[in-house]
Amino acid sequence: MAKKSAIKRKVKAPESINEQASVSEQSENEEDEDLLQAVKDPGEDTTDDEGIDQEYQSDTSDDLLFESDEEGNYLGRKEASSGEDEQGEEDDNDDEEEEDEDEEESGSSDDDAKDDQPSGSKATLSKTTGDSSNIAVAIPPRRDPSKPEYENSDTSDEEDIRNTVGNIPMHWYDEYKHIGYDWDAKKIIKPPKGDQIDDFLRKIEDPDFWRTVKDPQTGQEVLLTDEDIALIKRVNSARIPNPEHNEYEPWIEWFSSQVEKMPIKNVPDHKRSFLPSVSEKKKVSRMVHALKMGWMKTTEEVERDKQQKRGPKFYMLWETDTGREHIRRIHDPVSAPKRDLPGHAESYNPPPEYLFDAKEMKEWLKYKDEPHKRKLHFMPQKFKSLREVPAYSRFLRERFLRCLDLYLCPRAKRVKLNIDAEYLIPKLPSPRDLQPFPTVESLVYRGHTDLVRSVSVEPKGEYIVSGSDDKTVKIWEIATGRCIRTIETNDVVRCVAWCPNAKLSIIAVATGTRLLLINPKVGDKLLVKKTDDLLAEAPSSDVIESERIKTAVQWSNAEPEEQEKGVRVVITHFKPIRQVTWHGRGDYLATVMPEGANRSALIHQLSKRRSQIPFSKSKGLIQCVLFHPVKPCFFVATQHNIRIYDLVKQELIKKLLTNSKWISGMSIHPKGDNLLVSTYDKKMLWFDLDLSTKPYQTMRLHRNAVRSIAFHLRYPLFASGSDDQAVIVSHGMVYNDLLQNPLIVPLKKLQTHEKRDEFGVLDVNWHPVQPWIFSTGADCTIRLYT
């Protein structure tokens, strides 16, 4: 049978209003104590299970008793006994304090609650003083089975959630127009999203903008209440979120600190607790038997055995044994690379194709001082039988070098990266899209008997002039390849340069220690006559030249014999001239004498027939010089570096670092912002003068020394000539946008020259108008590529 406990509840009869007022006056003095007691002992709640406050009021002043089961169902009325009266009086005294608090807290809200609740289910609370004081207790009515059990209460926290997608990242719905689904499986459309201007206007106009947040589940904007703001402030200030929580409540001693003399449990001990353990007896007997038989050893004996097994200890004096290098050498050894197996060339009777012919033997002997350049470190030999093979003379040396490699060269494992070759190659435009540029050889100018060192083109592009080691200067017609005039000199012609001024017809020829200014007598006759009139007489000058300049250079008119050949002015230097170059206007020209020390570079003015030495100290062995096409700047190239000087301020502007062994030549872009440098160590260097003093790009397109390099005056082209008999034409576009880097694309390799005495192409020069290029070589020819 289900046990039912009778719950006694007392219902008190109503009292008059005056009596209630007198009770409230008596409780005013104890207000603070009642509030504190209410916090400590909240008392009973008058709310039933279904959330409706109900009160029962009797129709008489007698005390009534009711019985109810554990579920709160009404069982009936019962008379109170004497023992129950005493217990009820004690309960009433405790409940009076609770009634005072309830009256103060709900005094203002009772009248409103009366209007809201039905008249049949509510009654007024009454308070009395005396021994028979009682409180009104709510009697739960029976539930109507026709209504839902949880009609007026929330049964789940999830029923209020509109979006049913669950606890997932909401950015999954960024690409969709909806943000989830409601309880009816309908899409929750995202609210319209404003731009930054709308947000700014709302921030200005809406006073509640600062407390508006966006719900990530629905995308709607939620207005935070005052309670939410207070909660956020408390959390932000590191306080307890619940404001009703008292951090300083009186300590409640749940467990006593006094030592209890009586035991917690009063269970008599078992009989076996007084008897010795049988299992321990067996264990001890086994240990005694093991000691007698010698199987079991003492602690000292065990430590002694461990010490003998470990053996003597050795310590590293300078490093630990747990280092990475020690572990690698012990646990991850790297085996020595094996020597290559012998091939057919190392046989005592190799096939005939592996034996050297005269040309291969000469090439092999040529690298006697540089054996690392040889394809084979030995010369294959053929013997009739194995017994005729002599002892190998380099056996001990090779074994010695092998031993050095084994114990001196560090070993390491390298992870091979599988990188596609196309990924490493930069994406460049197709050469077909970069036309026009020279692709074929059109003409060969033959006539010199020795290597041709220099070539220069007339400003109008009709004639060329060449200088050779056969001590002659030849003038050629470009279109026909016919030699118009040959001028003999007394020494080797190192350099020729046609004046860039189209109003003058002058050629500067560097031969030995003399610089000849020649009128070629080709082209317009009026222009030829004007040039002769200009160079006929020396202009008067009041400037007194120093002895330093007089000993270095002397101006003079040509002899009558040379006048007939076209020579007009002779400038004699104190050292052999290597290079001559013109200024863009055609009035100044510079010469280079590598052996001249601090007077290696000289600048000559044609109109005033005077010279000047720009440098008083030698900064190195000068190789070549160059004028800036626009600015009054002077480029001086030594063996390793290039210095740029301002001729007006007479100061050093910039020093370019080439990181090369020996500079052979240089050429400047027509705009003057980029410089090309050729070196004898097979490199071409592109300098961006506005970017850095180091090369913007280093090109290694040739297999041998690069002797000459040149920019085209009109087209974005440049070319280089090398001792590998090749002329490489490249595309070099320089953009007006300073933020865009130059575009460099190799286009064509023209290799038609013949190699003589280890020399190939000696000089290259562009046609001033057409995309044509002239090259001179050691094969005594001049070749035109178009």
From Swiss-Prot:
<dbReference type="GO" id="GO:0000463">
    <property type="term" value="P:maturation of LSU-rRNA from tricistronic rRNA transcript (SSU-rRNA, 5.8S rRNA, LSU-rRNA)"/>
</dbReference>
<comment type="similarity">
    <text>Belongs to the WD repeat BOP1/ERB1 family.</text>
</comment>
<dbReference type="Pfam" id="PF00400">
    <property type="entry name" value="WD40"/>
</dbReference>
<keyword id="KW-0677">Repeat</keyword>
<feature type="repeat" description="WD 1">
    <location>
        <begin position="447"/>
        <end position="488"/>
    </location>
</feature>
<feature type="compositionally biased region" description="Basic residues">
    <location>
        <begin position="1"/>
        <end position="11"/>
    </location>
</feature>
<feature type="repeat" description="WD 4">
    <location>
        <begin position="617"/>
        <end position="655"/>
    </location>
</feature>
<dbReference type="GO" id="GO:0000466">
    <property type="term" value="P:maturation of 5.8S rRNA from tricistronic rRNA transcript (SSU-rRNA, 5.8S rRNA, LSU-rRNA)"/>
</dbReference>
<feature type="compositionally biased region" description="Acidic residues">
    <location>
        <begin position="151"/>
        <end position="160"/>
    </location>
</feature>
<feature type="repeat" description="WD 5">
    <location>
        <begin position="658"/>
        <end position="697"/>
    </location>
</feature>
<dbReference type="InterPro" id="IPR019775">
    <property type="entry name" value="WD40_repeat_CS"/>
</dbReference>
<feature type="repeat" description="WD 3">
    <location>
        <begin position="572"/>
        <end position="614"/>
    </location>
</feature>
<dbReference type="GO" id="GO:0030687">
    <property type="term" value="C:preribosome, large subunit precursor"/>
</dbReference>
<comment type="function">
    <text>Required for maturation of ribosomal RNAs and formation of the large ribosomal subunit.</text>
</comment>
<dbReference type="InterPro" id="IPR012953">
    <property type="entry name" value="BOP1_N_dom"/>
</dbReference>
<dbReference type="InterPro" id="IPR036322">
    <property type="entry name" value="WD40_repeat_dom_sf"/>
</dbReference>
<feature type="repeat" description="WD 2">
    <location>
        <begin position="490"/>
        <end position="528"/>
    </location>
</feature>
<feature type="repeat" description="WD 6">
    <location>
        <begin position="701"/>
        <end position="740"/>
    </location>
</feature>
<feature type="compositionally biased region" description="Acidic residues">
    <location>
        <begin position="60"/>
        <end position="72"/>
    </location>
</feature>
<dbReference type="InterPro" id="IPR001680">
    <property type="entry name" value="WD40_rpt"/>
</dbReference>
<dbReference type="Pfam" id="PF08145">
    <property type="entry name" value="BOP1NT"/>
</dbReference>
<feature type="region of interest" description="Disordered">
    <location>
        <begin position="1"/>
        <end position="161"/>
    </location>
</feature>
<dbReference type="InterPro" id="IPR028598">
    <property type="entry name" value="BOP1/Erb1"/>
</dbReference>
<dbReference type="InterPro" id="IPR015943">
    <property type="entry name" value="WD40/YVTN_repeat-like_dom_sf"/>
</dbReference>
<dbReference type="GO" id="GO:0035206">
    <property type="term" value="P:regulation of hemocyte proliferation"/>
</dbReference>
<feature type="compositionally biased region" description="Acidic residues">
    <location>
        <begin position="82"/>
        <end position="114"/>
    </location>
</feature>
<feature type="compositionally biased region" description="Polar residues">
    <location>
        <begin position="122"/>
        <end position="135"/>
    </location>
</feature>
<protein>
    <recommendedName>
        <fullName>Ribosome biogenesis protein BOP1 homolog</fullName>
    </recommendedName>
</protein>
<keyword id="KW-0698">rRNA processing</keyword>
<keyword id="KW-0853">WD repeat</keyword>
<dbReference type="GO" id="GO:0070545">
    <property type="term" value="C:PeBoW complex"/>
</dbReference>
<keyword id="KW-0539">Nucleus</keyword>
<feature type="compositionally biased region" description="Polar residues">
    <location>
        <begin position="17"/>
        <end position="26"/>
    </location>
</feature>
<feature type="compositionally biased region" description="Acidic residues">
    <location>
        <begin position="44"/>
        <end position="53"/>
    </location>
</feature>
<feature type="compositionally biased region" description="Basic and acidic residues">
    <location>
        <begin position="141"/>
        <end position="150"/>
    </location>
</feature>
<dbReference type="GO" id="GO:0005654">
    <property type="term" value="C:nucleoplasm"/>
</dbReference>
<dbReference type="GO" id="GO:0043021">
    <property type="term" value="F:ribonucleoprotein complex binding"/>
</dbReference>
<keyword id="KW-0690">Ribosome biogenesis</keyword>
<feature type="repeat" description="WD 7">
    <location>
        <begin position="756"/>
        <end position="786"/>
    </location>
</feature>
